[in-house]
Structure formats: structure tokens, C-alpha cells
């Protein structure tokens, strides 16, 4: 534990801290109307070209999730290879990013200081794999969406992270929870299939990988609940 003298702020830092605390009094303001999930899914302006290729089965499930009378904080997608699970996970994440983009001072939605960074994590085994699969697909979806190009442009100079500096928000690749320590992790996608061996043999390595996926799921779920659950319920979002 640090000594009190090590935590003492200089006058300049103290002023900065007081200014940041004052920022928390600024409320998040709606700057754009949020269109219904039905309209959003059918409109290439928001979803991009992928709006035309969403299976009706998945589309109805997405509508049910966002129109549920009870808030849904977790979605588990199952099915065989090529059934669209990764694409649907990305569309759900894209919708949440879109909703957040319709507010100014996004951190204030969760009673955080304006300078606080909001983070979403995309868990995969490694960056090269992530760029070829779900994380890379999400980045392309954002870049192909006219809405995001006009109203919520990311920093295109960065590919390892999807960053909106104007909103203090990012989607970051992560291979473990150590990549999210100290952040305000509001949500995540765990591409579980990429944590398993492609062989059906149960090996010690396969068990370790499975345990890692379970650990990531448990830790991120607990962190999200502790940091955001009460704030989310009380927010206007």
C-alpha cells in the first residue's frame, strides 16, 4: 500500500483534479435521435452493405434482444460453422456503439468523469488472427457504414485499436484480461471458438485454452457488473 506522502498532489495537479471532478456534473446530452432497431437493421446507411445479408432468423433475434422489456446484458450465440454467429455478434456490438454515439459526453452516462475512457474488448488468441476474423470484420463494418463516416469517424491511422478520440471510447483487441486492467470496460466479445484447438482430441493444451476462455468470461463479466451495473440502471442510456 502506498504511503500517504506518495499520494499527495501538488497544487497544479490538485487544480486539474478539481476541474475533472467538476466535469462529472456535466450531463450526457442526446445529440441525435436513435432510430428503432427495425429501421436500423434494414438501412445500409447504418449497417453498411451487410444490412442486405442478415438472415431473417438472426434479424428477428436481434430485434427481440433490443426490444426486450427486460434489459439483456449478455448474449450467447451458438450454432455450426458458417451460420453467421460472428457477424451477428458484430452487428449487436455495432448497434451499441451507434447508440452511444448519439450522446455527447458519453462517460457521463455512467457517472464517470468526462476524461474517462470507455472501452469495449474483442478477445481472440492473437492480433493477426483477430484482424482476419471478427475484430477485422467489425472494423470493416464501421468503415463501410455511411453513418459512422459522417457522424462518428474513428481514427483511421490505427488498426490495432478502433478509437474514437472525440468520445474517449475505443474497441481494443485483447488476448487476456490483463489488456483491460485499469480501463472502464463496458462490454466485450469473446470469440470462444478461436480459443479451442481445431482437433477434437482432448489434450492438456486444449484444456488450458478452454480454462483461459472461461477465466476471461468470468473476470470480464464480474468487472462489468461491478463498474457499470448500478450506473447503467440509473443512466438515461
List each model region and its residues.
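Phosphate/NTP-binding elements of NTP-utilizing enzymes
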Residues: 1-237
Amino acid at each position: 500500500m502506498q504511503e500517504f506522502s506518495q499520494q499527495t498532489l501538488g497544487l497544479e495537479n490538485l487544480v486539474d483534479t478539481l476541474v475533472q471532478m467538476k466535469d462529472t456534473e456535466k450531463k450526457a446530452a442526446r445529440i441525435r435521435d436513435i432510430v428503432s432497431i427495425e429501421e436500423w437493421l434494414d438501412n445500409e446507411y447504418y449497417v453498411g452493405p451487410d444490412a442486405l445479408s442478415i438472415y431473417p432468423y438472426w434479424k428477428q433475434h436481434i430485434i427481440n434482444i433490443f426490444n426486450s422489456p427486460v434489459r439483456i446484458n449478455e448474449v450467447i450465440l451458438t450454432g455450426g460453422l458458417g451460420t453467421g454467429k460472428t457477424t451477428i455478434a458484430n452487428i449487436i456490438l455495432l448497434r451499441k456503439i451507434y447508440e452511444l454515439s448519439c450522446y455527447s459526453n458519453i462517460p457521463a452516462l455512467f457517472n464517470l468523469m468526462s476524461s474517462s475512457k470507455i472501452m469495449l474488448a474483442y478477445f481472440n488468441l492473437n492480433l493477426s488472427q483477430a484482424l482476419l476474423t471478427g475484430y477485422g470484420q467489425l472494423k470493416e463494418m464501421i468503415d463501410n457504414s455511411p453513418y459512422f463516416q459522417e457522424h462518428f469517424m474513428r481514427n483511421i491511422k490505427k488498426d490495432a485499436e478502433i478509437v474514437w478520440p472525440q468520445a474517449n471510447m475505443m474497441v481494443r483487441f485483447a488476448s487476456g484480461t490483463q489488456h483491460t486492467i485499469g480501463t472502464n470496460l463496458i462490454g466485450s466479445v469473446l470469440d470462444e471458438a478461436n480459443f479451442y484447438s481445431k482437433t477434437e482430441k482432448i489434450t492438456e493444451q486444449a484444456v488450458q485454452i478452454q480454462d483461459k476462455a472461461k477465466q476471461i468470461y468470468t473476470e470480464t463479466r464480474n468487472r462489468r457488473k461491478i463498474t457499470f451495473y448500478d450506473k447503467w440502471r440509473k443512466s438515461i442510456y
